[in-house]
Structure formats: structure tokens, C-alpha cells
Amino acid sequence: MLSIKNLQAKVEEKDILKGLSLEIKPGEVHAIMGPNGAGKSTLGNVLSGREGYEVTGGEVSFDGKNILEMDTEERAREGLFLAFQYPVEIPGVSNLEFLKASVDAVRAHRGEEPMDSVTFLKLAREKCKAVNLDQNFLKRGVNEGFSGGEKKRNEIMQMMLLQPKLCILDETDSGLDIDALQVVAEGVNSQRDPNRSFIVVTHYQRLLDYIVPDFVHVLADGKIVKSGGKELALELEEKGYGWIEKAISEEKGA
């Protein structure tokens, strides 16, 4: 589904990703962990095509297509979804309008007719309930005046409606209490599917108690330096990232 080979990228002339490679098959959940500044959020932003990130080398293939040549909207229509660490507000545009337009754009890309408004409203209300959001949130501006937890739940609701092929969750657990974390995780787990894959970016292991990954990767100094199963996340929780950073430092000094 997703093939990343030797990906290199920079932000404001600073090299962040320095030869990252990763293969993700349909139905797999991959957790990306690492210290602050390792490039975790940069990876998600580069994959989604966010402005301000310059790819300087490498290849990224999504379902056999080179997504680096696509703009952000085209990548979304192809089935790539990014849940931001800090979801943005869009004042003046209701959640319902935004979601309907997004879903219809994806449907049009697939050659399908727009969903009629009555059917969509019923579906949106169902998804609101699934992530424990009041239906009044559909009338409000996108993320406008939402708490941190409400923004995260709103993004999971978007994911449920859009039905993407690849979901990138960028520190979705950031700032969430345990109850909100469980609601978000349940929403994510309900979308696990043999044809849908996830990249779960997190700094802490606790999210992975609820969204259990197939693979865990440690990102440090712009590339994946260690991979394993769920036990690797537990090791990181116990030891921290110091041992990883020390190994990298010794390797550079060798």
C-alpha cells in the first residue's frame, strides 16, 4: 500500500528526514515513536503534502502511485488522511458543510454520485454519537471553540466518514485525558480493516495500550533506527529514548 524509500526532507533549510524507509501493507498498523525533534510530525506532513516541507530525495509510492507529484487535495482524494497534532480552526464553515464537501469530493474521485443531504446528515449524526460528540457540533464552525479533546474526536469522526485507505494519526493522544483517549481509540479501532492501514505517531506508549500496533518503529535523527513489535514500545517506556540517542551519537563518532 505505502512504500517509502530513502525519504529526505527539510523545513526552513533544516534537514529533518535523512533517509527514512518504510513499507506498509494493507490492514497493518504501524506505530512511529521517537524523541522530540526526531521528525515524527514531519513524516506525516510530508506524506499529506502540507506546505512548507521540501522533499529533497527519495520516493513515496501509495497504491502504486507517486504521491510526491500530487497536491494535498489529490492525496486526500486518493485515500490518505492525516489527523493533526493541533487541528486547525475554520471559522465560518460549519462542520456539516465541511464534511459533506469532503465526502462528496472523495466520492466524485471514485466516480460516485454525491450523497444526498438527508442520508449524509443521518450518517454524520451516527458518527458523532460513535465518538461521543453532541450533534450540535455539526452546526458549529470547524474546530471553532472546541476543546483539545473535542478537536481530536472531531477528526476521528471525519476519518469515519471519509473512509480513507491510509490514516496517519499525529500524536492524537496529545493533551487527552484517559476517558477522551479511550473514546478516540475506540473510534480508530472500529475502522481497522484488512484494506485500511494506519500510521500512529506517538511519543508515549500509553496510546498503544488501546490501539495495538502490528509494528513499532523508532524514529531518531530523521530515520528509522529500530523496529519491532509491541514489546519495543514497552522497552521505550521503561528505558526512555536516551539509549537510542546514545547509540546514534556513538555511531556518528565512530
Go through the PLM ranges and name each one.
Residues L2-I4, L17-G19:
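Conserved structural motif at the start of ABC-family nucleotide-binding domains
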Residues V88-K165:
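ABC-family P-loop ATPase nucleotide-binding domains
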Residues I168-T172, D179:
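Walker B catalytic motif
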Residues F215, L219, K223-K246:
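Conserved beta-strand-loop-alpha-helix hinge in the C-terminal portion
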